[in-house]
Amino acid sequence: MQTFNADIAIIGAGGAGLRAAIAAAEANPQLKIALISKVYPMRSHTVAAEGGSAAVTQAHDSYDFHFNDTVSGGDWLCEQDVVDYFVEHCPTEMTQLELWGCPWSRKEDGSVNVRRFGGMKIERTWFAADKTGFHMLHTLFQTSLKYPQIQRFDEHFVLDILVDEGHARGVVAINMMEGTKVQIRANAVIMATGGAGRVYRFNTNGGIVTGDGMGIALRHGVPLRDMEFVQYHPTGLPGSGILMTEGCRGEGGILVNKDGYRYLQDYGLGPETPLGKPENKYMELGPRDKVSQAFWHEWRAGRTIKTHRGDVVHLDLRHLGAKKLHERLPFICELAKAYVGVDPVNEPIPVRPTAHYTMGGIETNQRTETRIKGLFAVGECSSVGLHGANRLGSNSLAELVVFGRLAGEEAVRRAQEATPANASALDAQTRDIEDNLKKLMNQKGSENWAQIRDEMGEAMEEGCGIYRTPELMQKTIDKLTELKERFKHVEIKDTSSVFNTDLLYKIELGFGLDVAECMAHSAFNRKESRGAHQRLDEGCTERDDVNFLKHTLAFYNPEGAPRLEYSDVKITKSAPAKRVYGGEATAQDKQNKEKANG
């Protein structure tokens, strides 16, 4: 067992983790920062984000507009003080990224270009062609290399955190390259481990997005908040989970059913907009939850297109022309050709909704700290209260840098004021973690982790998908209970120590099962329809602000189902109202202007 001493340990080296590391290094250059990642940083899932990052930049836009779009898009389950902080700090972070070298796309006059994104009243999504996540991550990674106090632990798998008298004090990890164990002591720990999309069978997430950080925090008594809200992205490639960015629709792409009809006009997002002239909050630029739900209704009505990869609709970009597609969406053209054999210049792309984003996560306060002193969470693994019941596209990349910076600065404050830890207590915890690992390694049985993982994914798709019924949710809950019992009998066939993926996948599955249970139980007990959580049973098809304008808190229960509690939503200036888009939104805006003008 190797021991390293640091001041701050950051788990995850994607956009949020790197931004936190840079912020901490700048806030106090004397502190040592351990940056721990399962993969080389440029392989983090942030790299897969294509569309863009939101920030007010145009004269006719405002923080209030961005606030209102976010709160309405989240179906009023957002913490409104958090949203205020977020929208006010987005422009600063986008500008900072540019100063560090992020190549934002430009207009002809040299100003930053912005594109339309779903649910946004005004175009405010900064982008770097259709590889925004890649360029942001590359910029952050390059910048982090300037700080010698940031020590990277690439290809290290975190098993658990160390907690002494209610204060986070470090982590224990496996060095995958050598097969050795590592204890990293610190006075503050930041979780930046990404979401949990891999608990679903079909998803847009990278293989490392398995809910590890959520599972670790959960087992230490930190609740997972609002886990029932899982976003389906409307335009994933069938079978692969590869995403066709929302930027396709922001540039003017359209969705049509088997009859070539732009069906979104029938679901509160119309009237139909002119071809190639997208309008904010209309049609294809509605919020993701509503666009995905429209697909489900078209499928039920028999108006989707049958393919060997399942039912799809068509994303048609042909009217945009080859020049625009190759300038603005070059990567999309490559992906469509590679994965479905379609050239978007000449043919429509088959797409269907795919599990994409976890709105819920590790509960934090507005400063990103959890209930454990010195333990912070940021990015998709966290629930700071920004996204509510449905995230707006391009708010997540901005969240990484806005709250990544905040988490880094707050961790510095905690690390500086910390008193010395009890070293013997940390060593005792480390031995317990090693003992638990040996038990996992030596477990005997006939079960296979891959089979259990596949069954978990299928169960989550069936019971916790776009639309939900109590019968199917209960079926999923029962299945997860069965799978957790079978998990106790998973035998590891690989006894080697170096890159033992058999062992690591088993550990990931254990975290995933815990997280999936929180999702399923939270969904079953939210007896209303809000945002990405939509129920079909009588009495639960509408939003219920009287009983469920509340956050769900799921607590770990080692003996069985998670224990659920509820907490109030912080509302500062936007009272819950009907979500409106398309022509109804335009009419509402007109009414509001008339009232304001007397």
UniProtKB/Swiss-Prot annotation:
<keyword id="KW-0472">Membrane</keyword>
<dbReference type="GO" id="GO:0050660">
    <property type="term" value="F:flavin adenine dinucleotide binding"/>
</dbReference>
<feature type="binding site">
    <location>
        <position position="380"/>
    </location>
    <ligand>
        <name>FAD</name>
    </ligand>
</feature>
<dbReference type="InterPro" id="IPR030664">
    <property type="entry name" value="SdhA/FrdA/AprA"/>
</dbReference>
<keyword id="KW-0249">Electron transport</keyword>
<keyword id="KW-0997">Cell inner membrane</keyword>
<dbReference type="InterPro" id="IPR003953">
    <property type="entry name" value="FAD-dep_OxRdtase_2_FAD-bd"/>
</dbReference>
<keyword id="KW-0547">Nucleotide-binding</keyword>
<feature type="modified residue" description="Tele-8alpha-FAD histidine">
    <location>
        <position position="45"/>
    </location>
</feature>
<dbReference type="GO" id="GO:0009061">
    <property type="term" value="P:anaerobic respiration"/>
</dbReference>
<feature type="binding site">
    <location>
        <begin position="391"/>
        <end position="397"/>
    </location>
    <ligand>
        <name>FAD</name>
    </ligand>
</feature>
<feature type="active site">
    <location>
        <position position="249"/>
    </location>
</feature>
<dbReference type="InterPro" id="IPR015939">
    <property type="entry name" value="Fum_Rdtase/Succ_DH_flav-like_C"/>
</dbReference>
<comment type="subunit">
    <text>Part of an enzyme complex containing four subunits: a flavoprotein (FrdA), an iron-sulfur protein (FrdB), and two hydrophobic anchor proteins (FrdC and FrdD).</text>
</comment>
<keyword id="KW-0285">Flavoprotein</keyword>
<protein>
    <recommendedName>
        <fullName>Fumarate reductase flavoprotein subunit</fullName>
        <ecNumber>1.3.5.1</ecNumber>
    </recommendedName>
</protein>
<dbReference type="InterPro" id="IPR005884">
    <property type="entry name" value="Fum_red_fp"/>
</dbReference>
<keyword id="KW-0560">Oxidoreductase</keyword>
<dbReference type="GO" id="GO:0008177">
    <property type="term" value="F:succinate dehydrogenase (quinone) activity"/>
</dbReference>
<keyword id="KW-0274">FAD</keyword>
<dbReference type="InterPro" id="IPR037099">
    <property type="entry name" value="Fum_R/Succ_DH_flav-like_C_sf"/>
</dbReference>
<dbReference type="GO" id="GO:0006113">
    <property type="term" value="P:fermentation"/>
</dbReference>
<keyword id="KW-0813">Transport</keyword>
<feature type="region of interest" description="Disordered">
    <location>
        <begin position="577"/>
        <end position="598"/>
    </location>
</feature>
<dbReference type="GO" id="GO:0022900">
    <property type="term" value="P:electron transport chain"/>
</dbReference>
<dbReference type="InterPro" id="IPR003952">
    <property type="entry name" value="FRD_SDH_FAD_BS"/>
</dbReference>
<dbReference type="Pfam" id="PF00890">
    <property type="entry name" value="FAD_binding_2"/>
</dbReference>
<feature type="binding site">
    <location>
        <begin position="44"/>
        <end position="52"/>
    </location>
    <ligand>
        <name>FAD</name>
    </ligand>
</feature>
<dbReference type="Pfam" id="PF02910">
    <property type="entry name" value="Succ_DH_flav_C"/>
</dbReference>
<feature type="binding site">
    <location>
        <begin position="156"/>
        <end position="158"/>
    </location>
    <ligand>
        <name>FAD</name>
    </ligand>
</feature>
<feature type="binding site">
    <location>
        <position position="212"/>
    </location>
    <ligand>
        <name>FAD</name>
    </ligand>
</feature>
<keyword id="KW-1003">Cell membrane</keyword>
<feature type="binding site">
    <location>
        <begin position="12"/>
        <end position="16"/>
    </location>
    <ligand>
        <name>FAD</name>
    </ligand>
</feature>
<dbReference type="InterPro" id="IPR036188">
    <property type="entry name" value="FAD/NAD-bd_sf"/>
</dbReference>
<dbReference type="InterPro" id="IPR027477">
    <property type="entry name" value="Succ_DH/fumarate_Rdtase_cat_sf"/>
</dbReference>
<dbReference type="GO" id="GO:0005886">
    <property type="term" value="C:plasma membrane"/>
</dbReference>
<comment type="similarity">
    <text>Belongs to the FAD-dependent oxidoreductase 2 family. FRD/SDH subfamily.</text>
</comment>
<dbReference type="GO" id="GO:0009055">
    <property type="term" value="F:electron transfer activity"/>
</dbReference>
<feature type="active site">
    <location>
        <position position="233"/>
    </location>
</feature>
<feature type="binding site">
    <location>
        <begin position="356"/>
        <end position="357"/>
    </location>
    <ligand>
        <name>FAD</name>
    </ligand>
</feature>
<feature type="binding site">
    <location>
        <begin position="36"/>
        <end position="38"/>
    </location>
    <ligand>
        <name>FAD</name>
    </ligand>
</feature>
<comment type="function">
    <text>Two distinct, membrane-bound, FAD-containing enzymes are responsible for the catalysis of fumarate and succinate interconversion; the fumarate reductase is used in anaerobic growth, and the succinate dehydrogenase is used in aerobic growth.</text>
</comment>
